[in-house]
Amino acid sequence: MSLKKIIDVKSVNTLLKKGIINKEGVRIIDCSFAVAPRPDWKEFEQEGYGDFKNLMAEPSPSRNLYLAGHIPEAVHVDLDIATYPSRYQRFQQYRADLFEEYAQMVGLNNKEHFIFYGKGAFGGMLFASKVAWIFKSYGHENISLVDGGFDSWKRNGFEVSTELVKLPAGNFKAEDNFKKYVITFQELEAKKDGEDKQFIEKTSEINFLDSRIRGQFDGTQETGLDPHLVNGTRIAGFKNLPSAELLVKGGNLKSEEEIKSWLTQNGYVENQPTITSCNAGIQAALLAYVIDAVKPSQNPPRVYNGSLKEMELRAPKKISEGPQHLPH
């Protein structure tokens, strides 16, 4: 089935009423996520890494959010199970062969179209876009993101379920498509033979987009960065395109033309490679998803999953622009 990359709740409701969800190659995926402190990565590595059966059996605040009310027929994908805490990243992606085990346990299949939605911040699209981008990086291209998320669904008066939806095990096969959709710290630091600049320093040739709110970028609001490690608020040469500004009041996305105009006004250059970042790779995924939807390209944006929280641990001097507070 051919569906747009961004879909409205009325279209989702039509699919539901026609009995298409979970029956005719379309799955709807609830991405409700309860933000929690970063788990101890060493402990998780020993006791939880890839143990999806036990992870899915444990109490889950995110699952509780899902069970409190969701779109009928929607299954839940938990970002804290789909990813794992590593030394440098809050949401590190598993190897493809491990991730597919989780996707199969949820009940997802290769040839299906996945519709992602969420609750809360950024019109419910913050964590939903992250999960959607994760699936893209594992080779699944048939995806849609629900504009306005669950709040929009409820505002329209559509049916809400509290049932735990369980599907038969799926046949989802994950591919390592990371090079197309995500970028690593090592790639950012790399230099090509004969070149003086690292990839991350080519800011005139590449759209390096910081998707945090302007106050964090400028240092007028708390950045979430460690002031003992970092003497700045942003990476030199990065442009600020806050994901929050993609939305109108009420939580829906701006029109496609408004988004295109906003991208240009904020320094986005057409046909340049694009890298998105934030603090932990979440807002960056929303910006990347929307750019990919309104400006489809053979070279889509790539998300820096580790973002500034990884950079402050591995190369803190890269975060050098903005207000300074440490002695030189």
Swiss-Prot record:
It comes from the Eukaryota. The keyword Repeat applies. Keywords: Repeat, Transferase. GO terms for molecular function: 3-mercaptopyruvate sulfurtransferase activity; thiosulfate-cyanide sulfurtransferase activity. It is an enzyme of class 2 (transferase). The active site is at C278. InterPro entries: Rhodanese-like_dom, Rhodanese-like_dom_sf, TST/MPST-like. Disruption phenotype: Knockdown and RNAi cause reduced lifespan. Knockdown reduced brood size and halved the production of H(2)S. The keyword Zinc-finger does not apply. It catalyses: thiosulfate + hydrogen cyanide = thiocyanate + sulfite + 2 H(+). It holds the Pfam family Rhodanese. Residues 22-162, 202-320 form the Rhodanese domain. Contains two rhodanese domains with different primary structures but with near identical secondary structure conformations suggesting a common evolutionary origin. Only the C-terminal rhodanese domain contains the catalytic cysteine residue. This is Putative thiosulfate sulfurtransferase mpst-1. The lineage of its organism: Eukaryota, Metazoa, Ecdysozoa, Nematoda, Chromadorea. The gene is mpst-1.
